[in-house]
Amino acid sequence: MRIRLADYVADFLVSHGVTDVFSVVGGGAMHLNDALGHNEGLKVTYNHHEQACAMAAESYARIDNRIAAVCVTTGPGGTNALTGVVGGWLDSIPMFIISGQVRYDTTARYALSYTETPLRAMGDQEYDIVKSVSNMTKY
């Protein structure tokens, strides 16, 4: 059976007991936004800022003693969530953070595989969020 990766992610969250997601929609996470919003096992709360999503997930875990997920878009969406992610990490509060990503073949990193041009940007509003969060996350 074929399934979209975004639907697999939503089903994975539900199968691991996640019932609540805090999100800000964005183009780089549009398939995730769609899958999370249509999954009957998930309640998605949309916020106005990514930092609010991370802080809401932290508060949710503190109050309900259960993990919540956060879904943000690429680039600035991921970096906007960092303050809340660090806060949760410092206090050992569990959160499941998902950051969208545009198609690899549309990024500058893909183009750089064919040239030696020293660009620091990965593409239009793209940023290597994995390197930034590696010191404040478990996985």
Feature annotation, model-predicted:
Residues 1-139:
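N-terminal alpha/beta PP-like core and its mobile active-site loop of ThDP/TPP-dependent enzymes
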